[in-house]
UniProtKB/Swiss-Prot annotation:
Residues 792-803 have a biased composition (Polar residues). This is PR domain zinc finger protein 4. Disulfide bonds: none annotated. Residues 757-803 are annotated as: Disordered. It is found in: Nucleus. Its main location: nucleus. SMART domains: ZnF_C2H2.
Amino acid sequence: MNDMNLSPVGMEQLSSSSVSNALPVSGSHLGLAASPSHSAIPAPGLPVAIPNLGPSLSSLPSALSLMLPVGIGDRGVMCGLPERNYTLPPPPYPHLESSYFRTILPGILSYLADRPPPQYIHPNSINVDGNTALSITNNPSALDPYQANGNVGLELGIVSIDSRSVNTHGAQSLHPNDGHEVALDTTITMENVSRVTSPISTDGMAEELTMDGVTGEHPQIPNGSRSHEPLSVDSVSNSLTAEAVGHGGVIPIHGNGLELPVVMETDHIANRVNGMSDSTLSDSIHTVAMSTNSVSVALSTSHNLASLESVSLHEVGLSLEPVAVSSITQEVAMGTGHVDVSSDSLSFVPSSLQMEDSNSNKENMATLFTIWCTLCDRAYPSDCPDHGPVTFVPDTPIESRARLSLPKQLVLRQSIVGTDVVGVLPLIGVWTAETIPVRTCFGPLIGQQSHSLEVAEWTDKAVNHVWKIYHTGVLEFCIITTDENECNWMMFVRKARNREEQNLVAYPHDGKIYFCTSQDIPPESELLFYYSRNYAQQIGVPEHPDVHLCNCGKECSSYSEFKAHLTSHIHNHLPSQGHSSSHGPSHSKERKWKCSMCPQAFISPSKLHVHFMGHMGMKPHKCDFCSKAFSDPSNLRTHLKIHTGQKNYRCTLCDKSFTQKAHLESHMVIHTGEKNLKCDYCDKLFMRRQDLKQHVLIHTQERQIKCPKCDKLFLRTNHLKKHLNSHEGKRDYVCEKCTKAYLTKYHLTRHLKTCKEPSSSSSAQEEEDDESEEEDLADSMRTEDCRMGSAVYSTDESLSAHK
């Protein structure tokens, strides 16, 4: 054992190749007791690869491990002798999660003692507070996996870690003894470390300690400084003190010194990030064994260097001189300044200035200081403090592909079609700069191709944003023209509103869209297209732009014809002679599945189950945009259209779009202005079915709030307040066309949609009817529509009870 060839090559590999951002650190010499002699093992020069753990936070080594010329694989440690290989547990390793550290030391000690490897040592079982503690030989259970209550003592200047219980302490051995074995108390002492290199990453570190060229005798590992950081010792001299021999039965090693790594474990209790005080830092420095050589400590620039004072290194077991504290500036780090690095000084270097290799500091520093001041002839991490910021000249903005591809005969201007879908931004159109003759072809149209069926039904935006391409009558794909960077200039050509405006014909050819002029287009004219007859039939639109197409498929050549056609639809959907206040419309299928909590019935048990989930408050279908939940997945799909802007139901008269077909049907009645929905109780007429339902509640629900000035009853107090305004003559919302006044802005807006001609006066009966209608419509404004069915409730409390 004493003749082992321990090459320092492995240590160089650890500090240079397998470790990045190595910082100079110094520690103390580690000695090891003797073991039975055996043949020398050739050193392959491969180090033990200590796991790459988290950064050290102002901590010093709390556990030490031997570096031997062996290798470590993904699942095991390979020693020089195959029979001594042992397997690591499968990842993830516990020390990465809960402050447990996996030390290679027990296996290495067992290797030296020619015994099977022990198990792991829990870090809490090591007493590092400098007080007298029990020896490990009196606590064999500390070698069991992760025994948190174990107590492994560290005596002054000596870390005692036994690979087994020794007979001298009266404890039973953990392993059977062979005939040639000698009872051994394997002990580590620390002395005369000439240099230690630490591959500590500076990511997210508050403070780091890096020690270079530190010597001392019997240093003590500080409390709370366990941090898993792999360190490598380049060379360790063999100068054990005579007092170490025989201490606790320790037998010193004779021969060349061993190469030693230092394993540190992060303390998750003390010295956290941004939580390290100056006293804690001083305590950590106190315990570093240093006497005559300098120590560099890398700190974050946010640390208050002014609060650091001279550090005294007199502790139990230490007799060292105090060291002075100074700050290394950027000039010193760049090589332009000088700092006193005498043997008794301790210098603090900002972590941003600490480099991996001290020989290349100047080269690496240039990457940190990126702003070069030509007047000062130096670099700064930010603006020059003397001359201020530099002047930057930005690049010329590059126009989009759509604008750059515009032919020279055309220009882009505001379109005569109007504004965008939102009704805010003006649309950009394509105008002619010179005469364009008839049968001039433009194209093909370039855009993004999509095979999604959802995009094929995307009709809420301008029609020319989605172009459907068919092959043998089957939709093949869609061309989307919404991104200027992906399309050409043809995306700006707008659709004509009537036949007089049309001067282009859009037609498909070989899976592409082309525009062809249908007439000579003079200068200063906007290009406006409409579809060819065949293409219009494919996509299901009228053959001419001024034709009104009803949802039933009928084409009307004039607005009057279209209005008359809509009226016929309304008469066909008039309620029957039965009470229209019944809960929900009639259905062709029988609703035999009735809810036990409300009067609703359903055509299938699955729909009843979904409805019942609403009563129970179960809403498993959640919106990814606003976290709103629904019990019915169809309601979620309808709700998602609000976020995506998908409105597939468009009014052919005013181009207003809706997310639901029922909303479109209710909107279409506004254009006719006819009140065809009749109340079965009082024969009052309404335009919208929703208004009729709300009105029926007046007849079916009891009104208990009475007006103090008249005998009229109300359902809510806010209705009474509005009614009192009518007694006082307060109608602040006046129609500019007919001078008719209303109590609320909502009712005035509804009136403006149907107001056709001025009216100077109104009869008293009309005023009274308007007041009643306003009251009824006020109820409809606050009505909560249950999405689980067609039920409507007059109060929020009723809706909650329904759900």
